[in-house]
């Protein structure tokens, strides 16, 4: 088996806390980079290094020797993104450009970016595919779209993969209850009943283990 040296941004967040134990279990060496606004729920491991840092200064970090960069850093969800648009653009776009440039200069082989299915906006089509036009509405999904474009401009220098997951749900050591499925599950467990507003709308979801 080929074991890789992997650098992960946003590593202590909702998705990273599920992904990193899987990478370690497969024998890879992982450096977890996170600002740790919500602490660190990663368990200690011989192949894990945890670095507290601001992704907006990622150009100061040495990426030489890494095979893959997985970019999960983000100001998560639409309301948070709109709360401080300047911070959202800095984290999702400026930092993304600095990270891509750093990775390229450091001869990183592959780049995986966690974008969002929300870049499509609100569609009337029953099924949303990659062929449909991107019509982002909020600061969150606008910055995701721009960040994709930044990474794709480096596709001639390294392998670039942009994934657009549906709303990620499921259990994580760094739990999020702003996600509808998680919130309804919590309500059901705590109150024995759930509250559904509307009831006619549809929303795509993906389990966190299927994404990681």
What does each of the following model-derived ranges do?
Residues 46-57:
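Rossmann-fold cofactor-recognition segment
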Residues 55-91:
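NAD(P)H-binding glycine-rich loop region in Rossmannoid oxidoreductase-like domains
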Residues 12, 75-79, 117-126, 134, ...:
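Active-site segment of SDR-like NAD(P)-dependent oxidoreductases
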Residues 97-139:
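Conserved Rossmann-fold NAD(P)-dependent oxidoreductase catalytic core, especially the SDR/UDP-sugar
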Residues 143:
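Active-site helix of classical SDR
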Residues 149-203, 208-210:
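NAD(P)-dependent short-chain dehydrogenase/reductase
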Residues 6-26:
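N-terminal Rossmann NAD(P)H-binding glycine-rich loop of SDR-like oxidoreductase domains
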């Amino acid at each position: 088996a080929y074991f890789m040296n992997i650098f992960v941004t946003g590593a202590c967040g909702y998705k990273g806390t599920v992904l990193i134990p899987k990478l370690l279990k497969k024998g890879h060496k992982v450096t977890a980079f996170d600002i740790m606004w919500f602490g660190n729920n990663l368990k200690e491991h011989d192949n894990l290094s945890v670095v507290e840092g601001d992704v907006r200064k990622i150009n100061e970090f040495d990426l030489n020797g890494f095979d893959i960069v997985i970019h999960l850093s983000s100001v998560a969800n639409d309301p948070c993104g709109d709360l401080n648009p300047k911070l959202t653009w800095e984290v999702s776009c400026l930092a993304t450009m600095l990270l891509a440039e750093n990775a390229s200069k450091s001869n990183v082989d592959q780049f995986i970016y966690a974008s969002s299915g929300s870049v499509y906006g609100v569609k009337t089509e029953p099924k949303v595919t990659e062929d449909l036009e991107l019509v982002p509405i909020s600061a969150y999904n606008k910055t995701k779209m721009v960040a994709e474009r930044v990474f794709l401009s480096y596709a001639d220098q390294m392998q670039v993969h942009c994934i657009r997951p549906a709303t990620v749900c499921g259990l994580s050591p760094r739990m999020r209850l702003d996600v509808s499925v998680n919130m309804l599950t919590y309500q059901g467990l705590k109150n024995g009943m759930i509250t559904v507003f509307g009831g006619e709308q549809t929303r795509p979801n993906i389990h966190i283990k299927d994404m990681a």
